[in-house]
Amino acid sequence: MDGTETRQRRLDSCGKPGELGLPHPLSTGGLPVASEDGALRAPESQSVTPKPLETEPSRETTWSIGLQVTVPFMFAGLGLSWAGMLLDYFQHWPVFVEVKDLLTLVPPLVGLKGNLEMTLASRLSTAANTGQIDDPQEQHRVISSNLALIQVQATVVGLLAAVAALLLGVVSREEVDVAKVELLCASSVLTAFLAAFALGVLMVCIVIGARKLGVNPDNIATPIAASLGDLITLSILALVSSFFYRHKDSRYLTPLVCLSFAALTPVWVLIAKQSPPIVKILKFGWFPIILAMVISSFGGLILSKTVSKQQYKGMAIFTPVICGVGGNLVAIQTSRISTYLHMWSAPGVLPLQMKKFWPNPCSTFCTSEINSMSARVLLLLVVPGHLIFFYIIYLVEGQSVINSQTFVVLYLLAGLIQVTILLYLAEVMVRLTWHQALDPDNHCIPYLTGLGDLLGSSSVGHTAAVPRRCTASPGWGLIQPFICTQHLIVSLLSFYFPFCLLAKTSI
């Protein structure tokens, strides 16, 4: 949501910020000025001074955050576990066997759902926490424009995801089948549209319901979106692609589907334009979700190349779980930090305690600040969460799941490293984007979830291959966990440092 619409509400029951151990909200003395690129900046002539108004600060504690996050997180994990088992089942369907690029399409398409729904949930949560959807007329405008926006994004990026999957397939196989191209494009666009609509309506209901119940939507909206999102998206993709595969003799069916949804795009644009902040996203918000889709596509390539190989047994089941858990947790943290900045500062102006663009990692996880508290809670959920999800998958799948101690330990370590890096990057990216007067809800979550997909896919690929090597060579099995752990850390950090250099050049 846009910084110009941020409202601070006075509540008689709330104490002053100083009494709660929180910094005073900042005021620029006026409305931000829009720049040519659509970003909002505070006027330079206006100084940032403490604003002695009572606001609606967060009274959350570690326990309250944990209680609110844990239940939806576990519910989300169940959905991710079922999604992994469904993917393991769907990979043997004729359409997935015949059209290999469908597996390449899974991470970017599921990631697209995550990007759209999590950014939607984050925008709506910020709007709810700042009081913008309390007025019925304003609520209708915000909801309709946001739903129309994600339909535009789903149609365009769904088509681009299919193109990316095809290009990666061409590079590796050097062959193009026009019928398969049409099937892939139609399946991607229709799946993206249906999933975006269903999950968008669900997000609206969750945020409004949470607001009425007095629960922070930031803590529950994104986990619930993740719990059903992957399951719904995978199911729709499998059913839609199988339908087109059965009717592959109907020459004009798939092109007609693509053209029909393309023709609806101007209608969604007109509806979305009733909200000025959404207009800015339509103009300038494409790069994050497209780049995130490209990053996720490489994770899809890893999945498609390894899922059918015996030495990578478990890729199909555990890839959605580790990718979904990482993206879920980092989206919660990003949404919380974004809401904090919308409530306590103005676009382009960082609070005093967040002035450093590159904070010490210890300050991200080990201080008494509310964002550090939430980061600790989210990090503590990783290992027990993955253990529970692994046990559920093992109970359902039985002996078909890798259950060696080496795999379990490395899998948990990979998930812990992945989430640690993502949570730290969330802190850095939100500060950088807010300093540039950009909305973190729209610019950070796509990058972080896309990176989480790539890190998750590569991590599962490394860990899945270890048990067989251990069995083949007992001596190798003793040292392989340490070598693989070192390789995982180096691989994950190799994605972090290029981002640091890129971000520094943009300041």
Curated annotation (Swiss-Prot):
The gene is SLC41A3. Residues 1-60 are annotated as: Disordered. Pfam families: MgtE. It is found in: Mitochondrion inner membrane. GO terms for cellular component: mitochondrial inner membrane; plasma membrane. Na(+)/Mg(2+) ion exchanger that acts as a predominant Mg(2+) efflux system at the mitochondrial inner membrane. PANTHER family: DIVALENT CATION TRANSPORTER SOLUTE CARRIER FAMILY 41, SOLUTE CARRIER FAMILY 41 MEMBER 3. The chain crosses the membrane at residues 67-87, 152-172, 189-209, 220-240, 252-272, 284-304, 314-334, 377-397, 406-426, 482-502. Belongs to the SLC41A transporter family. GO terms for biological process: mitochondrial magnesium ion transmembrane transport. Residues 1-13 have a biased composition (Basic and acidic residues). The keyword Nucleus does not apply. Gene3D superfamilies: SLC41 divalent cation transporters, integral membrane domain. This is Solute carrier family 41 member 3.
